[in-house]
Amino acid sequence: MMLAIEKLSVSYGGLAALRGVSVAVEEGQFVAIVGPNGAGKTTLFKAISGVVPAGSGAITYEGRNLLAIPPYERVHLGIAHVPEGRQVFAALTVLENLEMGAYSSRGRTTWHRNIERIFALFPVLAERRRQLAGTLSGGEQQMLAIGRGIASSPRLLLLDEPSMGLAPAIADLIFDRIAALHREDGVTLILVEQRVAEALESCDYGYVLETGQVVLEGTHTALTANDRVRRAYLGM
């Protein structure tokens, strides 16, 4: 098991954001986590990457107690978090943003290979490598945010709402590139996404979070056939 989250609870000022959440991710798996706004999906990612502290429960990554490891060291273990809202460094160029993603020892030793892969996945970034990130379109900034994650040479890549605010055609392109990264590179992916149909279609296994709890889980086939999922999230 690459990642095991067991009975994880997280609170903000006494307000419970996650309540006893358990998630299991095998190496090479593509896992989707879906649910409404405020369900705790982003909080789950922040707990994995160490941005917010866990109140109780456990997170184990490749046999290590992740909660005992400082956030800045988790990237060295091969965990990369592509945050909601892209959060690129607007005043830096595209190439400088990618270099920032490669600051870890993993990223530095594989920089040349990774940059070639990033530019193969997102050719527009190669064309605009000297352009300031703040002048890119929303879709291009999302490509850059994903590329910055890839630059760290991750074994586990957390993708938080990569389609947020994007035109449908651009969101479709982003999903296609994410699927290619998983299929061709074997990177273990956890995707948080509100475009539920696309997320469940792409994943091997999925979880539905509501009000900070896992209410459903299963293969993409099982979840897309589930009446509750079809009514609440797929409009069927």
Q: Regions from the language model: what does each represent?
A:
Residues 57-65, 77, 111-115:
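Conserved ABC transporter NBD signature motif
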Residues 34-36:
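The feature captures the beta-strand-to-loop junction immediately N-terminal to the Walker
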Residues 149-150:
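ABC ATPase C-loop
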Residues 172-186:
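Helical segment within the ABC ATPase nucleotide-binding domain
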Residues 132-136, 140:
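Conserved ABC ATPase signature
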Residues 13, 69, 94-113, 121-126, ...:
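ABC-type ATPase nucleotide-binding domains, specifically the catalytic core motifs of the NBD
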Residues 49:
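Helix-to-loop junction immediately C-terminal to a conserved catalytic motif
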